[in-house]
């Protein structure tokens, strides 16, 4: 698979910034149908680094209400936490 068919975006938050600076772990939102091997290959091809481990979490969309009171559901998504080999780093702007 192409890297753009696997990786959607980089998730930046306080927790993900702490993981990247202390443990060398980076957080990505990925497409639902991808597996750990495809995610590792896409990160290695895109950022020219060596992936040590990939952890994946599936999230269900939250229940919400619109202005008119109608119930709706947010989008489901899949998150991947990628651990890099010691010494490797991804420069995120």
Swiss-Prot record:
Write out the entry's keywords from A to Z.
Answer: Ribonucleoprotein, Ribosomal protein, RNA-binding, rRNA-binding
| Domain of life where this protein originates | Bacteria
Stretches assigned to coiled coil: none
Q: Name one GO cellular component term.
A: ribonucleoprotein complex
Which Gene Ontology terms describe the biological processes this protein takes part in?
A: translation
Describe its partners and assembly state: Part of the 50S ribosomal subunit. Contacts protein L29, and trigger factor when it is bound to the ribosome.
Q: What is this protein called?
A: Large ribosomal subunit protein uL23
Gene that encodes it = rplW
